[in-house]
């Protein structure tokens, strides 16, 4: 709960936080730079001068142009052949051999299918999972809630420190707790995920 309270407070304070860097165009007059530094309380070592464009998010406007000849084909993650058109259970496949899914290259659908099957399977007693960037209306959360409502033991470590997704993760963590899922938030100062 301490970590949850700390993250909720950090989110509230985010809009009032101090500037951590100031990016300026190389042609900006020194007096304007000095006014900005003074008003934003930024030291000179936190000022970055660039001769390129500022605010790179505006480059998305180029992506919105209807020019398919200038774009890569949309990427579609693959589903391993052994998990396509399952006539039987996903558990039957897993009894035959282990599977390694490499996201985002492999589809996340088999993971959702596994959780949904586990939620309904009377032989499954518990589901334990770590959640990082949960997203909006996530089928994973729906499957975990269903499992809990089917009297399964469900435990989830929810990574609250998913930068700019904290509010979403807090919402879904509380939603899981509301149906009786045991939710842990990790440890202060320690992330529970990695990027490979």
PLM features: residue spans?
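N-terminal localization/anchoring segments of enzymes in phospholipid and broader phosphate metabolism
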Residues: 1-196
């Amino acid at each position: 709960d301490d970590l949850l309270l700390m993250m909720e407070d950090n989110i509230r304070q985010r809009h009032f936080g101090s500037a951590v860097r100031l990016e300026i165009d190389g042609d900006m007059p020194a007096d304007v730079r000095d006014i900005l530094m003074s008003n934003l309380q930024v030291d000179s070592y936190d000022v970055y001068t660039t001769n390129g464009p500022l605010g790179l998010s505006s480059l998305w406007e180029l992506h919105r142009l209807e020019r398919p000849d200038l774009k890569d084909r949309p990427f579609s993650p693959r589903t391993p052949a052994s998990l396509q058109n399952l006539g039987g259970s996903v558990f039957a496949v897993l009894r035959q051999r282990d599977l390694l899914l490499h996201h985002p290259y492999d589809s996340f659908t088999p993971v959702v299918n596994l959780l949904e099957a586990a939620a309904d399977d009377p032989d499954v007693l518990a589901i334990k999972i770590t959640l990082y960037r949960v997203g909006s209306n996530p089928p994973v959360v729906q499957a975990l809630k269903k499992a809990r409502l089917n009297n399964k033991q469900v435990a989830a470590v929810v990574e609250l420190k998913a930068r700019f997704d904290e509010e979403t993760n807090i919402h879904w963590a509380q939603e899981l707790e509301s149906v009786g899922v045991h939710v842990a938030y990790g440890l202060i100062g320690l992330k529970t995920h990695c990027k490979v």
